[in-house]
Structure formats: structure tokens, C-alpha cells
């Protein structure tokens, strides 16, 4: 049968189109205005000015940002002496990674239900002009002053549509104030999306020094094991981890009758260490794709797992993902801002920044 040349060309173009569609997913996009972030950060846009002018900077309805606990400014403002920094924009390109506990009807039952969306992971990835990568985590319980509302509160409470800007813009304004770092781009993922990404990689390796668990949400044996997305998520967000005390014991019905005790030292900071370890472990999995098809499966999983800002194109986002393969993950600086524990008068546990962010990075030789 004679095949029409034009038909061959058409089929070729169609195949290329299908191939490109599969490679470049349809990420959810969100507006992100760096100029608005600057205005919020400087205090030029606040809830007071909005009430005075009647101006609205966001069409989104306010949502529950998590902890509504507000601390008395005159009592706690003296604790924020390190919450400002020189600008360091010229040193890095910065990416803000926000992990939220937003649930949907498809979310794992072990995580329960919750209204609204809280910033459970706040991670800044900084890339200098030598392509050296540093990861800086900000604990969710860090005490800050919100430049929009002027409330003194935990930093995760600033991830909300409070009238000044979007959730990401408001959080970026807080970060600009306490770090001197302008966020260039952000990416946001939910619990469900996080699980989906890990499952698309056929699991991720987690190594622990002790057999540990939290209720029925996870149990990890001492050593290294490859786990699915649900178990990995439950592990990094766990606040009530227990460790095995002695030998693992089962009764005649196979029920666990072992002795378990609370893990000592569990805190927001230990959760951050787990988050960083897991993210690097994920990056290493990306670095070791066995085939292009496995890469396609991973990229396709991102379609409903991430939200990215509108200032970065889908093509650029895909290139960034592919370029992760070139990173020497052993040389990534994993940092957590130095903090101290503080208990408020009503018994709330918060963290206080112990060192100015500029001085902190200087001490790590990252501003040379």
C-alpha cells in the first residue's frame, strides 16, 4: 500500500506533540509578585493601610493559616532582635519550597483531616554563581513579626491570604525581613502530592539508628529500608515518635507486645533534619534514573503534586528538574538557622532566632 508523504509528516508532527505533552506537565500556576513582596516586607502595605485605602491586593478569600496564636508585641518584641538581616540578593538565586498539610478526599487516612492549609515545611534552596547549592530550613515554630498584620506569631501563621498578598507572597515577605533574601521562585506541594512523587519513584530509602514508630502510621526497622510515600511522609512529620525498648515481641496472634518508649529530643529541628535528608534522598533518586520512561513517569506525577509561580515557565521548570542530575548531592550544604527554645507565659513552645542570618551565612563561608 502506497503511503502518502503528507500523512507521514502529519503522523510525525502528531507523535512529537504527544511526546512533548507527556514530557512537559501542566503544573498548577500561582501569581507571585516580587514587587508586592517588597512592599509588604517594608511595611508599605499592611492590614491597616488596606482598611484606610479600601485597597485589595488579592482576590483570594482569607484562609486558616494554621496557628492563630498571637503574642503580645510589647512582651515578646525584645526576642526578635536577630530577626533582620542585610540584603544578600546578589549572592544567590533563591527558591522557596513550601510543604503544606492541606488535605483532600484522596489524602492518606493516617494523616487525619484538617481545615485550611499550614506551612509544615519551609525550605530555601540557594544557588550561587558557582552553582553551589545550599539548603536552609526555617522551623515552623520560629517566632516572627508579620509585616502585614504586625502580629508577633509563629512563621507558619504567615502562610495565609491575609489581604496584603497571597500565602506565598506573605511568607516570602517575612523571609525577606529575617534573612535579607529575596525569593526568586517558589514551589508548593501538599501531603498528597509529596506521597505521589515518592510513589512514582517506587519509594525512597530511609535509614534510622533505632527501630521506631508512631502509632499505626509507620514503623521503621533499624537500618535502611525503602518505603512508600505514605510512610515517608508520616516519618518526617512525626511529633510523637517511639523507639523499640529491647527485643521485638509478638504474641500468639501476631500482635505486637514489645516495649516502646518515647524518642528523646523530638522537636521541630529534628523534623527539619529528616526533611532535608529525605529531600536529598529524593534528589539522588532523580540522579539515578534507569531509563527515560522512568523519568517521564516521575514528571507526569508532578502534574497535580506541585504548584509553581507564574514567573517561571513550564519549560524552565522541566529543565531545572532535569539539571538536578548534575548536582553533587554530597556537597550540598544542609543548614538550619540557629535557634533557642522559649516557653511563653501561656505555655506555648516557640523558637527564637539566636543569630542574624547574614552573620550565620558568613560563619559558613557562604558570602565570600
What are these regions (language model features)?
Residues 4-7, 11-12, 18-368:
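Non-catalytic, solvent-exposed segments at the cell envelope interface
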Amino acid at each position: 500500500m502506497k503511503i502518502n508523504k503528507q500523512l507521514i509528516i502529519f503522523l510525525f508532527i502528531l507523535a512529537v506533540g504527544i511526546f512533548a505533552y507527556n514530557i512537559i506537565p501542566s503544573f498548577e500556576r500561582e501569581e507571585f509578585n516580587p514587587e508586592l513582596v517588597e512592599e509588604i516586607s517594608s511595611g508599605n502595605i499592611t492590614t491597616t493601610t488596606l482598611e484606610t485605602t479600601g485597597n485589595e491586593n488579592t482576590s483570594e478569600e482569607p484562609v486558616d493559616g494554621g496557628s492563630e496564636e498571637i503574642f503580645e508585641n510589647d512582651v515578646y518584641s525584645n526576642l526578635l532582635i536577630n530577626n533582620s538581616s542585610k540584603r544578600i540578593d546578589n549572592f544567590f538565586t533563591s527558591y522557596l519550597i513550601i510543604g503544606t498539610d492541606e488535605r483532600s478526599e484522596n489524602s492518606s487516612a493516617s494523616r487525619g483531616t484538617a481545615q485550611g492549609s499550614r506551612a509544615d515545611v519551609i525550605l530555601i534552596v540557594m544557588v550561587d554563581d558557582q552553582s553551589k547549592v545550599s539548603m536552609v530550613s526555617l522551623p515552623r515554630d520560629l517566632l516572627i513579626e508579620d509585616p502585614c498584620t504586625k502580629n508577633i506569631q509563629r512563621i507558619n501563621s504567615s502562610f495565609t491570604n491575609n489581604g496584603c498578598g497571597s500565602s506565598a507572597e506573605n511568607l516570602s515577605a517575612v523571609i525577606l525581613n529575617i534573612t535579607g533574601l529575596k525569593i526568586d521562585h517558589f514551589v508548593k506541594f501538599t501531603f498528597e502530592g509529596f506521597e505521589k512523587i515518592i510513589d512514582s519513584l517506587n519509594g525512597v530509602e530511609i535509614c534510622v539508628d533505632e527501630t521506631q514508630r508512631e502509632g499505626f502510621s509507620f514503623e521503621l526497622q533499624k537500618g535502611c529500608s525503602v518505603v512508600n510515600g505514605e510512610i515517608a511522609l508520616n516519618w518526617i512529620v512525626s511529633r510523637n515518635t517511639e523507639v523499640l525498648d529491647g527485643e521485638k515481641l509478638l504474641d500468639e496472634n501476631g500482635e505486637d507486645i514489645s516495649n516502646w518508649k518515647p524518642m528523646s529530643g523530638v522537636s521541630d529541628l529534628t523534623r527539619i533534619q529528616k526533611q532535608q535528608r529525605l529531600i536529598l534522598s529524593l534528589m539522588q533518586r532523580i540522579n539515578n534514573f534507569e531509563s527515560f520512561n522512568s523519568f517521564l513517569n516521575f514528571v507526569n506525577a508532578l502534574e497535580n503534586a506541585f504548584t509553581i509561580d507564574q514567573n517561571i515557565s513550564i519549560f524552565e521548570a522541566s529543565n531545572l528538574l532535569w539539571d538536578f542530575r548534575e548536582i553533587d548531592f554530597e556537597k550540598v550544604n544542609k543548614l538550619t538557622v540557629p535557634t533557642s527554645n522559649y516557653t511563653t507565659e501561656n505555655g506555648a513552645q516557640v523558637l527564637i532566632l539566636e543569630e542574624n542570618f547574614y552573620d550565620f551565612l558568613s560563619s559558613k563561608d557562604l558570602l565570600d
